[in-house]
From Swiss-Prot:
GO terms for biological process: tRNA wobble uridine modification. The lineage of its organism: Bacteria, Pseudomonadati, Campylobacterota, Epsilonproteobacteria, Campylobacterales. This is tRNA U34 carboxymethyltransferase. The keyword tRNA processing applies. Transmembrane segments: none annotated. Carboxy-S-adenosyl-L-methionine binds at residues 56, 70, 75, 94, 143-144, 163, 278. Pfam families: Methyltransf_9. Homotetramer. It comes from Campylobacter hominis (strain ATCC BAA-381 / DSM 21671 / CCUG 45161 / LMG 19568 / NCTC 13146 / CH001A).
Length: 285
């Protein structure tokens, strides 16, 4: 951690304990059924502002509404009908600040563990968990650390990660190695249309993001999963990303989806590639 991050962690750790009630709905909320003094409300808001950018959410903590860039409940609600987490050990790879894990915390899972190497998102999680007290565990680790983690899982969520990996088949193998017998992986990745066994590999960037590598056709994604020895490739949904789901707010810095697309043709990125579309799949071993 740098000095600013250490200061933020200290500020979070110095927050008083508050007897909160929680709501793990579309807006994940921590609130009190008694009057909270203005000094504490101000402190909570200032820490939340200092933790920007907030990519995933939304949250409301002691009357501070955190309007995140992504309306993450759209993705969660799309996947929820396919979730059966009762009594299971669950991992979320690339968990960001833990939004999806908080949403899962009332679905009966035995254990919920998030993996993400991002320090800023870890600090956001620590801030949220101070009030939510969900019991979710957060590890500052990535998908490459899974094989050596020492625990295996019944359900793994890997949402919006695969296109950031320069070796996606290896990442899939790392996910598979971390499953218990009969386990499942929920995947979400960007894709391109077509039936050919091909990928888009952006020259310099995709939607102004430099660490996006392979955008496969769905058939190619299935090939990757089969190469990693998964079976039962099940398409759950296909959805274009739009500005209802991802947009600029006061809780992020810089640009968002509207700035990443061609201003004259929203079906193309600023670089001229097809605009983002996502496929949601479940695979098993």
């Amino acid at each position: 951690m740098n000095e600013n991050e250490k200061k933020l962690l200290s500020d979070i750790e110095c927050l008083p304990n508050v007897d909160c009630k929680c709501d793990f709905g579309d807006i994940v909320r921590a609130f009190a059924d008694y009057k909270i003094n203005d000094e504490l409300k101000f402190k909570v808001r200032q820490i939340a502002l200092n933790l920007r950018p907030w990519r995933k959410g939304p949250f409301e903590i002691l009357e501070t509404f955190i309007d995140s860039e992504w309306q993450s409940f759209m993705k969660f609600n799309l996947l929820k009908p396919f979730m059966d987490l009762q009594g299971k050990k669950v991992a979320d790879i690339g968990c960001n600040n833990g939004y999806y894990l908080f949403r899962m915390s009332n679905l009966g899972a035995k254990k919920l563990i998030g993996f993400d190497p991002g320090v800023r998102t870890f600090l956001q999680f620590r801030f949220l968990e101070h009030f939510l007290k969900s019991g979710v565990i957060y590890e500052l680790l990535g998908v490459e650390n899974l094989p050596d983690y020492g625990e295996k899982f019944d359900s793994i969520f890997c949402l919006g990660v695969l296109y950031h990996r320069s070796d996606p088949v290896r990442a899939l193998k790392e996910l598979k190695s971390s499953l218990n017998s009969g386990g499942e992986v929920f995947l979400d990745t960007m894709f391109i249309d077509g039936d050919d066994e091909i990928c888009l590999f952006p020259r310099l960037s995709y939607a102004k993001i430099s660490n996006i590598y392979f955008l496969p056709t769905i058939r190619t994604l299935q090939n990757w999963c089969e190469r990693a020895k998964f079976k039962d490739f099940e398409i759950l949904a296909v959805k274009a990303t739009d500005e209802n789901e991802q947009r600029k707010t006061d809780w992020i810095y810089g640009q968002s989806l509207g700035d990443f697309l061609d201003p004259f043709d929203k079906t193309r990125t600023i670089e001229g590639y097809p605009a983002p579309k996502r496929v949601y799949v479940r695979v098993k071993i």
